[in-house]
């Protein structure tokens, strides 16, 4: 008979252990430090644009671009927080509203959130959008004030249409007392190509580009946060340089560096280690990469998943150690589509999907010459095969493909 483990004191035992962390929260993306390193130029540029709000004037709308982890959100929130502080000191009504468009990704939800921020009772569903917009305008136009709306990851919002941006960009013509300005933040330099020209013109009155951090700058940021996050003497000598080096390879991504520093500590703490060492950083890098791949793969469209699964099947059966060609991949892709009754795309479109997987870092595609047979792309996987396969097969539409390899490969490699 197996004796059940008593749960008495389960968490007390864990809490009794000495934590290597002083304040883990300072390593999370949601934390904005009192001093932002290596972003003075960007802070001053944004402050120069927004200072007109403190004179009761409407600041220009701003678009901020830069790759992930270049400080866009941190700078925008930092400047916004300072703007609100100074406006209080000067007895000027100035509100900064932060919206994450990855979460609030529809016109209705955006307007409802804005209205609720100004204490209007608006349900999260059910009303006509025009009515919600009217409520928002009524709420803000009750007094003289300047409102700055920060739309982080704005490109996620316009995937469902730019009507709301058009309406917000013209809102000042309907207001008597309040003034509204917008700041759009995006990782995608090309997202404005999908905007109505009128929206593009009014939204992009000013543009700021955030360059990537270099390894030395990332190291400075990590040292600043490490002092707040960890107890003295906990970090090994090579931990911060290694985190900075890994992140510098990822286009100077400070967010990735901070994640590495945090996850390294979590791994060490779970193993009851008194110090965070280089080996913990390397394991954290592997874990974060797997987690990133899992999340990206999980959110791929069905057709992209089928393209990726085709490559995995070829890689696992008969092609191990060899790169896969686009022709071989398309052959398997067609059979997978037949098997689960999905529309078959043209080879050109499938090649486009494969190029998107390349851009996401999931595959690596290289054009090679086959002499008189022309040119083709050779594809190799850049992600852990088994983890990726498991994530793909979580999709109910792909579940029938679990045992499919035999029927495909008997035909192709007999």
Curated annotation (Swiss-Prot):
Name of the protein: ORC1-type DNA replication protein 1
The family this protein is said to belong to: Belongs to the CDC6/cdc18 family.
UniProt keyword list: ATP-binding, DNA replication, Nucleotide-binding
Gene Ontology terms for molecular function: ATP binding; ATP hydrolysis activity
Gene Ontology biological process terms in this record: DNA replication
Residues involved in ATP binding: 70-74, 213, 225
Name of the gene encoding the protein in the UniProt record: cdc6-1
Cited function: Involved in regulation of DNA replication.
InterPro entries in UniProt: AAA+_ATPase, AAA_22, Cdc6_C, Cdc6_lid, ORC1/CDC6, Orc1/Cdc6_arc, P-loop_NTPase, WH-like_DNA-bd_sf
SUPFAM superfamilies: P-loop containing nucleoside triphosphate hydrolases (SSF52540), Winged helix' DNA-binding domain (SSF46785)
Organism: Methanosarcina mazei (strain ATCC BAA-159 / DSM 3647 / Goe1 / Go1 / JCM 11833 / OCM 88) (Methanosarcina frisia)
HAMAP family: ORC1_type_DNA_replic_protein
């Amino acid at each position: 008979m197996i004796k059940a483990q008593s749960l008495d004191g389960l968490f007390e035992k864990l809490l009794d252990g000495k934590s290597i962390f002083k304040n883990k929260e300072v390593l999370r993306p949601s934390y904005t430090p009192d001093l932002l390193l290596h972003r003075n130029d960007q802070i001053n540029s944004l402050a120069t644009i927004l200072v007109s709000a403190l004179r009761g004037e409407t600041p220009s709308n701003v678009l901020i671009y830069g790759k992930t982890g270049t400080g866009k959100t941190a700078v925008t929130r930092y400047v916004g927080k300072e703007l609100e502080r100074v406006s209080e000191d000067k007895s000027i009504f100035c509100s900064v509203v932060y919206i994450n468009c990855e979460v609030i990704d529809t016109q209705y939800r955006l307007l409802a959130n804005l209205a609720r921020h100004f204490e209007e009772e608006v349900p999260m569903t059910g009303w006509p959008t025009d009515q919600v917009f009217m409520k928002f305008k009524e709420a803000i136009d009750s007094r003289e004030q300047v409102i700055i709306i920060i739309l982080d990851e704005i490109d996620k919002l316009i995937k469902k249409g730019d009507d709301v941006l058009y309406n917000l960009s013209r809102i000042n013509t309907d207001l008597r007392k309040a003034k509204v300005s917008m700041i759009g933040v995006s990782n995608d330099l090309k997202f404005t190509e999908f905007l109505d020209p009128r929206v593009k013109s009014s939204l992009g009155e000013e543009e700021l580009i955030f360059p990537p951090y270099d390894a030395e700058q990332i190291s400075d940021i990590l040292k600043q946060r490490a002092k707040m996050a960890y107890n003295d003497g906990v970090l090994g000598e090579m931990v911060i340089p290694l985190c900075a080096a890994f992140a510098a390879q990822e286009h100077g991504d400070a967010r990735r560096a901070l994640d590495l520093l945090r996850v390294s500590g979590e791994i060490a703490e779970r193993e009851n280690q008194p110090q965070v060492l280089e080996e913990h950083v390397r394991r954290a890098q592997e874990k974060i990469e797997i987690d990133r791949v899992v999340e990206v793969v999980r959110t791929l469209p069905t057709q992209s998943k089928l393209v990726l699964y085709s490559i995995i099947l070829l890689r696992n059966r008969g092609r191990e150690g060899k790169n896969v060609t686009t022709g071989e991949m398309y052959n398997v892709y067609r059979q997978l589509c037949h098997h689960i009754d999905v529309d078959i795309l043209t080879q050109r479109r499938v090649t486009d999907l494969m190029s998107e997987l390349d851009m996401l870092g999931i595959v690596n595609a290289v054009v090679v010459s086959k002499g008189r047979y022309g040119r083709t792309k050779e594809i190799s996987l850049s992600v852990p095969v088994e983890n990726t396969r498991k994530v793909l097969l979580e999709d109910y539409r792909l579940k029938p493909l679990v045992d499919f390899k035999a029927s495909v490969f008997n035909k192709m490699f007999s």
